[in-house]
């Protein structure tokens, strides 16, 4: 019998560990317009010149991310895997996604490679891994950026006990225009493109995170009717089955 593919996705956005269902991962048929890193972050952003792996801040205050404890690293938030942003899955069949995107515009070379695999071991236990590699070359000389990002996770959701665990890492580097070598050149007769600039400015950032949450729930059983489709004597018929679900009354 063919098992239908169903994928559930959620996050633990707060340390109170209340699960929050989110949109399914980007696919060719679903949410593909959100696959761009900057557009996924905000529809209106300010960057430092590179299309990918550049310090970024949303012009829309409500869209800004403050998931990193260090205020000086908030500009890297969209590229970092934090425990609050970690996605957890539950699938009826193993799910994998491999994508490669490349920008062919002259002077703005971009490479974006992503990989995701997740699957269940039984109904309650799920394991998965996700990795991303970004590489971009900016319009000006000596501007470039790289990002290596990944995470591994596991979740167990039983009738009474649940567990979520994850480990994420992000490592990025960005070479940018470091500004004018001498600000007094602004008063000179040089054209803007001829002003001497610092071309060796570099930013490197590494972020590691680990997360583990255990929860136990006192539940109440409730029966409900579920209709299933079966074939009898060459005919398709529907039969009702009685199933039991557990309604949480109190969690610890």
Placement of each model-derived feature along the sequence:
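Transmembrane beta-barrel strands of outer-membrane/channel proteins
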Residues: 98-102, 131-133, 165-171, 250-252
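Outer-membrane beta-barrel translocator/channel fold
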Residues: 44-47, 139-149, 153-210
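Extracytoplasmic loops and strand-loop junctions of Gram-negative outer membrane beta-barrel proteins
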Residues: 79-80, 98-99, 134-136, 191-200
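Structural signature of outer-membrane beta-barrel domains
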Residues: 103-105, 134-136, 170-175, 217-223
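Short strand-turn segments of transmembrane beta-barrel domains in outer membranes
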Residues: 69-72, 82-88, 92-116, 138-139
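Surface-exposed extracellular loop regions of Gram-negative outer-membrane beta-barrel proteins
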Residues: 111-151
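Residues on the lipid-exposed face of transmembrane beta-strands in outer-membrane beta-barrel proteins
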Residues: 98, 115-119, 152-158, 212-218
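Repeated loop/turn-to-beta-strand initiation elements of outer-membrane beta-barrel proteins
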Residues: 124-127, 160-165, 221-224
